[in-house]
């Protein structure tokens, strides 16, 4: 019986390997022979996820962005640049073109990262607060909760640093200049509430703090409790999801 199971398992494994191989052939043909940008994107994702060949994936995304201006590939390429996996040049400026293409195609995170590039100045490029605000607003309009939250903190007058890398890890970048917006607590509250409605717990906590302290808005302890409770509820849900992530029943 065990021999039969082993034989069946081996056959299934062989069939899966053949399927994966055929998918790769199909994507290569679509990309290189038929010159279809969407096939190149799929090929890049195939090399990234199934072959774990990140160098090849980056090259495919870059070419598809440079030659075809394909938004998804441009976003992928931009994120690889942010993660420091594209050569030795750490210049954020090179992210502007690919992220602009992604943003123009309504990829929310593309707008958010494009905004953050403009928010963070470099030695040879000053921060552009106007563009940073514009693109962060666009990301928020596209229902990117993180963008709404960041925008709300900017309107508090804080100089937030670019802290998120491609892996979602905190990383403080040493930049000579950061953008700044005039303090506007009405706008800060507006975008903080919007981010809270998109389940960003730290934004709910910010709203609670504003109402509790009367920071730029009328003091309202009932509203403070409401948003504090909402922050706790979201955090409990996130913890529960993390706990159950590996449960298959």
From Swiss-Prot:
Q: Does the keyword Thylakoid feature in the UniProt annotation?
A: no
Q: Give the superkingdom in one word.
A: Eukaryota
Q: Which InterPro entries match?
A: HcpB-like (IPR040239), Sel1-like (IPR006597), TPR-like_helical_dom_sf (IPR011990)
Spans of repeat Sel1-like: 37-69, 71-107, 108-144, 201-236
Q: What are the annotated GO cellular component locations?
A: mitochondrial intermembrane space
Q: Which keywords accompany this UniProt record?
A: Repeat
The family this protein is said to belong to: Belongs to the hcp beta-lactamase family.
User: Can you name this protein?
Assistant: Cytochrome c oxidase assembly factor 7 homolog
């Amino acid at each position: 019986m065990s021999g039969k199971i082993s034989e069946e398992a081996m056959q299934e494994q062989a069939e899966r390997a053949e399927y994966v191989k055929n998918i790769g052939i199909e994507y290569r043909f679509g990309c290189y022979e038929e010159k279809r940008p969407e096939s190149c994107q799929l090929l890049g994702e195939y090399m990234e996820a199934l072959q774990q060949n990140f160098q090849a994936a980056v090259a495919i995304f870059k070419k598809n962005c440079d030659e075809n201006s394909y938004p998804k590939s441009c976003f992928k390429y931009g994120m690889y640049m942010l993660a420091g996996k594209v050569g030795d040049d750490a210049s954020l400026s090179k992210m502007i073109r690919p992220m602009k293409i992604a943003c123009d195609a309504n990829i929310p995170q593309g707008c958010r990262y494009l905004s953050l590039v403009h928010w963070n100045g470099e030695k040879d490029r000053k921060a552009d607060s106007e563009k940073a605000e514009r693109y962060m607003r666009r990301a928020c309009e596209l229902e990117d909760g993180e963008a709404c939250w960041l925008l709300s903190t900017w309107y508090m007058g804080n100089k937030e640093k670019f802290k998120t890398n491609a892996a979602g890890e905190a990383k403080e970048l040493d930049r000579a200049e950061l953008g700044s917006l005039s303090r506007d607590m009405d706008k800060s509250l507006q975008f903080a509430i919007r981010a809270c409605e998109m389940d960003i717990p730290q934004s709910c906590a910010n709203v609670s703090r504003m109402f509790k302290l009367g920071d730029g808005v009328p003091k309202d302890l009932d509203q403070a409790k409401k948003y504090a409770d909402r922050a706790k509820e979201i955090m409990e849900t996130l913890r529960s999801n993390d706990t159950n992530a590996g449960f298959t029943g």
